[in-house]
Amino acid sequence: MTADRQWVKIIARWLARIDGISGMLRLAMLGLTGVSTMSFTLKDYGLERLVWPLIGAMCVGTLLFAYYYTEGGVWNQVHRDKRDMSQNYATPFQKISNEMTARGLYAGEKGSELSQEERQAIQKEIDMAYMELRDGIEVEKDD
């Protein structure tokens, strides 16, 4: 069910943005540790007037980062690249599955069992394709 109230839509959108950068939030926590250390250092040097502007700048920077990371297309591109890297190669399971599919389809078209020569030809062709694709293919980038 889609929300009808505007404030629900706004909150849901921001929660989706935050969820989109949840991996980056760990980096933000490290930044917060850095700000804490820097605020103590600034206080020790008598520059505590710079602490609140520093914290404010970090908060604004985090919101801007969340917005541009999700709405600017970075999040989508990261997920596309991850998908390309994780699915861009042939696995032994795919080799076995493809060989079984090829045998089944060819036997079905033929209407009878395959001969040993036909099985070897299918296996040889799939082995060649597997060797070509097991390390992945080069995915073209839109530049």
Curated annotation (Swiss-Prot):
Membrane topology recorded in Swiss-Prot or TrEMBL: Multi-pass membrane protein
Domain of life according to the entry: Viruses
Annotated localization: Host membrane
Protein name: Putative transmembrane protein ORF32
Organism of derivation: His1 virus (isolate Australia/Victoria)
GO CC terms: host cell membrane; membrane
Transmembrane intervals: 20-42, 52-74
Record's keyword terms, sorted: Host membrane, Membrane, Transmembrane, Transmembrane helix
Main location: host cell
